[in-house]
Amino acid sequence: MKFIIKLFPEITIKSQSVRLRFIKILTSNIRNILKHCDESVAVVRHWDHIEVRAGDEQHRPLVADALTLIPGIHHILAVEERPWQDMHDIYLQTLVMYRDRLVGKSFCVRVKRRGTHDFTSQDVERYVGGGLNQNVDNTRVKLTHPDETVLLEIDNDRLLLITERLEGLGGFPIGTQEDVLSLISGGFDSGVSSYMLMRRGCRVNYCFFNLGGAAHEIGVRQVAHHLWRRFGQSHKVRFVSLDFAPVVNEILAKVEDGQMGIVLKRMMVRAASAIAERYGIQALVTGEALGQVSSQTLTNLRLIDNASDTLILRPLISHDKEHIITLAHQIGTEEYAKTMPEYCGVISKSPTVRAVKSRIEQEEGQFDFAVLETAVAQAQVVDIRELVAEEGNAPVAEVETTAELGSGDVVLDIRSQDEQEGCPLTLANVAVQTLPFYKLGSHFGELDQSKLYLLYCDRGVMSRLQALYLREQGFQNVKVYRP
């Protein structure tokens, strides 16, 4: 089994020293990943391509699939390597391999050569193509947009019969650019933006601001691990988790409603910048897209940037949501993102779209920055390779979901204030109380603990996460209400 790896074109136009460094890094990345598929694999680099050889034919599908997910590869050619004697011998070997595939179809022959020969690539194309056209039933030559393209490579005295061409991921090999820290929430945007920087050659570490307890963190860890396992497994990265619930509570208590969203984002940037500085990471990555939500206007993004000197990269800045969701589907994070609730955008009822710097600084002047410093100091840092084993050993937490209401039960509407006011929840003969999810941690203990509380939200996702969080805190009198 042999594969020929073709380099991403932008690599080939680099200077000699840079190109050689990129090829060395890509070769190392391929070795690191393929050793999990086949320990016998051999990876050999050349100036314009990389060869991959593996002894066990059973591992061919695994190796091929893994190669398509490694940044820096333009395409992969699965080949059969054979000796050849003359041009007619090349034709005969090609006929045996392609005869059945070409019956009733149009085709063309494309040849590449390396070495010194007494014929040109075009000579081989004409000779082999003419022979196939005469000896394969009901076929015809078509040089543009044929049904089948017969790909051949002649490498000195070896004939490479290309059995399959697989498209690669493109981009630069991971490790050719510097490290970044992705602010990951588990939603569509942050997952796609992380992938885009991995594809561009960055080793992507992950920073998660936990507002929803352990259940929320597990979901985000799954997204981060999926991205790493699928596209970045060649390198070790960190997953950093910060408990940001105290920071949110401080904002809710000290900051005016319309400024809360911007202040929260600025606090996240400050915290992430401190983490990046600790580990020598050069830039932050966010999934913000221009105008998608109120905090993502140019005025507000500029104010968010001003919170830190650390470079903030926004690869999705000009992308629309439909395109982002399409990319999430392609990279496999869509299913995770569908069930991930949005936290940051619901703490403010009337967020400003044109924040004023002096006003933001005035609001932040009332904020106790010791709370933020504590969150950074207590950040949990995990090697992403340990996440699966750690989650596999953790007990699976569950909480009961019900549509039935008892006479003494209380339905607790945990939606944000504007959602509650826009669509109030009214139930006959059942008490309904309101307590936004971001206040549950600090206010649930003040409620009458002799009663059973059924947590409600529109989709049932946020209510389940919050019920699990309350269970972790020792409250057993909670269920999820799904009418």
Curated annotation (Swiss-Prot):
CDD domains: PPase_ThiI, RHOD, THUMP_ThiI. Gene3D superfamilies: 3.30.2130.30, HUPs, Rhodanese-like domain. Transmembrane segments: none annotated. Pathway: Cofactor biosynthesis; thiamine diphosphate biosynthesis. Residues 405-483 form the Rhodanese domain. Its EC number is 2.8.1.4. ATP binds at L183, I184, K265, G287, Q296. SUPFAM superfamilies: Adenine nucleotide alpha hydrolases-like, Rhodanese/Cell cycle control phosphatase, THUMP domain-like. PROSITE patterns: RHODANESE_3, THUMP. Belongs to the ThiI family. HAMAP family: ThiI. This is tRNA sulfurtransferase. It comes from Sodalis glossinidius (strain morsitans).
